[in-house]
């Protein structure tokens, strides 16, 4: 049977790749809610595409309230839920091989937003179900593929689904790493803010912003400074660049205006984007720019003091919450990560987002409460509705985990 399955996918490989590329072309970033489209027009479109494709492949499929697409292998009761998603994080910039929604295959790799997270694996799971059906493999229970469209934002897709349907006895998600991950860290995904009265004494920071999504380490950030000479700003930025690896450019907003007349300078910071779960693989342009701005000789103000407090809580390249006082780890689930990947500072206040992946040992008391108090001390308020997401752990010796590992070993030979 294994040989038949292998031959089947050799025959259908190009067909599957074509369908993966077709779904990548849909820019399914969570958008403004529209009537009947809770996650935006493009996310509704991608669910409709997936359901239509599933039907073409001979499977039963339906879209539920434009929140999830549900695809069944047969009419039996569901024994297995396969959880995948078709929404993606914002495209960002700095793409080199291709544009984010123009998929290409180069040197044996498929490039495009969602190719690995999670459109490629979702379509692969769909073709696995088609293979079972086409090869006449008889199953006494149903496998159900549940395709969400809000995983990257708030997981309202699966929340909706499981408010309507019972969980299957077993489930897995093709949205991780091989051979298998049996632990999902808990987390804290929340907002913070601070307000103050505008102060006009020069020099001052007019604005600082960056980031496209809370769960993406930003590669771009920008700021406007008023009342300092370009020479001073460039000197600080050069020092910060040497310390952080963040690249800075400094340009006048209005050339020809002197510092004592309120000359304004535009600062751009460029880093490297990555997923927030592995922040060390990127270089956070937002925290790099905050570090530079906090080092400038600006006039004392409530806003500048708050920015310095933020720089102390989230210092550049502190991936583990050491400065915030929440660093911790355990042998099973690893180390806590903490970062701020979206910040918007203006003359009367700031707001930002926090992304933390918390190990099994983390709790409200030793993580959320500590971070809230740390922010409060700097005049920054965490969203009062903040809650920690609990971790999920299935012990390695469970039969379902062992079955999945055995399948991987048989197919991959490792």
Predicted regions and their residues:
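Active-site-adjacent substrate-binding region
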Residues: 232-249, 393-414
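Midchain, well-structured core segments that form catalytic/ion-binding scaffolds
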Residues: 152, 158-359
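Active-site metal-coordination/substrate-binding segment of hydrolases
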Residues: 79-147, 153, 168-169
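Buried hydrophobic packing segments
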Residues: 50, 122-132, 161, 225, ...
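C-terminal structural cap/anchor segments
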Residues: 348, 361-393
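Zn-dependent metallopeptidase/amidohydrolase metal-coordination segment
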Residues: 8, 80, 343-348, 388-390, ...
């Amino acid at each position: 049977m294994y040989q038949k399955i292998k031959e089947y996918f050799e025959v259908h490989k190009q067909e599957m790749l074509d369908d993966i590329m077709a779904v990548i072309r849909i820019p399914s970033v969570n958008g403004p809610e529209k009537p009947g489209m809770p996650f935006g027009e493009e996310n509704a479109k991608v669910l409709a595409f997936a359901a239509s494709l599933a039907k073409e492949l001979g499977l039963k499929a339906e879209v539920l309230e434009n929140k999830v697409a549900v695809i069944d292998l047969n009419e039996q009761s569901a024994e297995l839920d396969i959880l995948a998603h078709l929404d993606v994080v914002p495209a960002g910039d700095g793409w080199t091989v291709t544009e984010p929604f123009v998929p290409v295959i180069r040197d044996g790799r498929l490039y495009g937003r969602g190719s690995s997270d999670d459109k490629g694996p979702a379509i692969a799971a769909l073709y696995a179900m088609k293979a079972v059906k086409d090869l006449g493999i008889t199953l006494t229970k149903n496998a159900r593929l549940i395709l969400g469209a809000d995983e990257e934002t708030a997981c309202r897709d699966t929340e909706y689904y499981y408010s309507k349907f019972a969980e299957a006895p077993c489930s897995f998600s093709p949205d991780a790493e091989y051979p298998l991950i049996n632990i999902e860290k808990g987390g804290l995904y929340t907002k913070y803010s601070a307000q103050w009265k505008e102060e006009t004494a020069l020099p001052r920071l007019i604005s600082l912003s960056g980031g496209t999504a809370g769960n993406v380490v930003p590669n771009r950030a920008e700021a406007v400074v008023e009342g300092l000479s370009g020479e001073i700003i460039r000197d600080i930025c050069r020092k910060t660049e040497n310390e952080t690896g963040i690249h800075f450019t400094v340009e006048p907003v209005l050339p020809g205006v002197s510092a004592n007349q309120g000359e304004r300078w535009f600062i751009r910071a460029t880093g490297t984007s990555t997923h927030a779960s592995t922040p060390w693989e990127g270089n956070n342009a937002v925290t790099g720019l905050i570090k530079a701005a906090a080092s400038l000789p600006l006039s004392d103000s409530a806003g500048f003091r708050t920015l310095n407090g933020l720089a102390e809580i989230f210092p550049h390249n502190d991936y583990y919450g050491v400065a915030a006082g929440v660093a911790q780890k355990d042998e099973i689930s690893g180390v806590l990560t903490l970062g701020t990947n979206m910040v918007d500072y203006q003359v009367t206040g700031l707001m930002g987002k926090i992304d933390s992946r918390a190990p099994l040992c983390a709790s409200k008391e030793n993580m959320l409460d500590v971070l809230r108090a740390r922010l409060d001390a700097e005049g920054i308020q965490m969203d009062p509705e903040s809650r920690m997401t609990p971790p999920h752990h299935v012990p390695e010796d469970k039969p379902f985990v062992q079955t999945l590992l055995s399948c991987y070993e048989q197919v991959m030979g490792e």
